Amino acid sequence: MKPTVAIVGRPNVGKSTLFNRILNKRVAIVDDVPGVTRDRNFSEAEWCGKQFSLIDTGGYSRTGDTFSAAVLEQSLIALQEANIIILVVDLRTGITDIDLEITELLRKQASEKTVFLAVNKVDNNLMESDAQLFRKLGLSEPYFVSALDGRGVAELLDAVIAHIPEDDAPESDDTVKLTVIGRPNVGKSSFVNAILGQNRQIVTDIPGTTRDAVDSRFKRNGQDFLLIDTAGLRRKAKVDDNIELFSALRTEKAIERCDVAIILLDATQGLENQDLKVINAAAQKKRGMVIAVNKWDLIEKDDKTAIAYEKRLREELRNLSYVPLLFISALTKQRIYKAIDIAYQVWQNRRMKIDTSRLNNLMLNDIKRTPPSSKSGKEIKIKYLTQLATEPPLFGLFAGNPQLIEEHYKRFLERKLREHFGFEGTPIELKFRRK
C-alpha cells in the first residue's frame, strides 16, 4: 500500500499550488478566493522513484458556516488517513490564531504521525530571516518554500520521501477505473459516499457543491476499483467564472481516464438535454457505460413503473440500446452495489478477446444469410473478420469494395456481434479493409 501524504492549512496559504507543484500539473483548482479547495483532492505522486498518494485538503477555517464545518470534517478524515502531514503556513500573514489552532489539532489528532512545516511564499533568501518566526509553532524544522515558482520544494520532498519505506509489492495495474458523471445535483457524491461508507465528499442540496474530481480506491469481491467523482457537466452558459470552467474540464478529463462511466440520472426529473450531453461525452470517448437512475425512492410506483420508465428512456436513447440501465437510490443504498457489479462486467466486456475462428464461424454465416448490398450494384463480399484490439473491442472486416458498405449494414454487423458475444455496456468499433 502506498503511503499517504496530506497537505493541510488554513484557507489561501497555497496548499493547492503546492499540491500542483509536487505533481507538476494542474490538478486542484487554484484561485485567489479563500476556500476554493472545498474537498480533499487525491492524486498519485512520485519523487526520486518513491510513490505516494497526495491529498490536498480544503482550508481549515472557523467562520461557522456550513461549508467551513464540512471542510473541517474533511480535514480531520485526511489526518486520519495520512501517514505524513505537510502543514502549510503563509509568510506574508505571519502566525495567525488559526495556524495555532491547527498546530494544536495536529498535536492531538496526529501525534504519532510525521509532520513537516512548510512556510510558503518565501520568494528569496532575504525573506528566510522573517520566516524564522514560524519556529515558535514548535513543530519540526521549517522548510522555506515558494510553491508558485518551486523554490525549496525539492528539499521538502527529499525530507518527505526519507520517511517512506521502499515499496516491496507494487500495486496491480489490474484496477477497474470508474467515473461517476451527471449533471449537478443528481446525487454523484451521495453515491460515492454510499459506496465508500464515509462522508468522503461535501454533500448539500446546493447544485455544484462538489467542485473537484476526487479519486477513491476500494475493493469489492477481491477486485480493486478506482472511483472518480466529478463536479458535474454544466451548460456553457452557466460556466461564468474560471473555477466552474476548470471543473467542467476536469469532468471531461475524468471521462478520458476511466474505463467505465456510471452515468447518474435524476428519476424525479427525467431525461434532460444536459443529461444527453453527459451521455454523449462518454460515448464519444468510447468508454464503457452504465446508466443508473437515482432517487428511485422518491418515485410513486407500482409493478409497472420501472418497465414504463425504462421503455421511455430507451426510446430517447435508441443509439445506446447496448448500455445497461438500473434504478438506484444513493440515499437508501438500494442497488448501488449492483451498479458497481454491472460496471465490473462492462469492464470485462471491454477487455474481451474473441477467437478468430469462432468469430468467423458465427459472423460469416450471418453475412451469408444477409449479404451487404450497394446502390451502385457492385459486389461487396466480406471474406473474413478478426479482432484488432480491445478497450473498446475493435474488429477488422476484410472485403472487396469496403467503401460501399452502408451505415445500416454496419449497424446490422454490430447487432450480430452483440447477439453472439454480448459486449453489454461497451461500444464496438468496426474497421473495413480492402481484401
Swiss-Prot record:
Q: Where is the KH-like domain?
A: 352-435
Molecular function as annotated in GO? ATP hydrolysis activity; GTP binding; ribosome binding
Task: Output the InterPro entries linked to this UniProt entry.
Answer: AAA+_ATPase, G_ENGA, GTP-bd, GTPase_Der, KH_dom-like, KH_dom-like_a/b, P-loop_NTPase, Small_GTP-bd
Task: Please state every residue range assigned to the domain named EngA-type G.
Answer: 3-168, 176-351
For this UniProt record, the keywords arranged alphabetically read as follows: GTP-binding, Nucleotide-binding, Repeat, Ribosome biogenesis
In terms of Pfam families, this protein maps to: KH_dom-like, MMR_HSR1
Q: Which residues does the record give as GTP 2 binding sites?
A: 182-189, 229-233, 294-297
Q: Which ranges of the sequence are coiled-coil?
A: none
> Which residues are involved in binding GTP 1?
9-16, 56-60, 120-123
Q: Give GO BP annotations, semicolon-separated.
A: ribosome biogenesis
Q: Return the similarity comment.
A: Belongs to the TRAFAC class TrmE-Era-EngA-EngB-Septin-like GTPase superfamily. EngA (Der) GTPase family.
Q: Which PANTHER family match?
A: GTPASE DER
Q: How does it assemble?
A: Associates with the 50S ribosomal subunit.
Q: What does this protein do?
A: GTPase that plays an essential role in the late steps of ribosome biogenesis.
Q: What is the name of the protein in this document?
A: GTPase Der
Q: Give the classification, highest ranks.
A: Bacteria, Pseudomonadati, Chlorobiota, Chlorobiia, Chlorobiales
Gene name as annotated: der
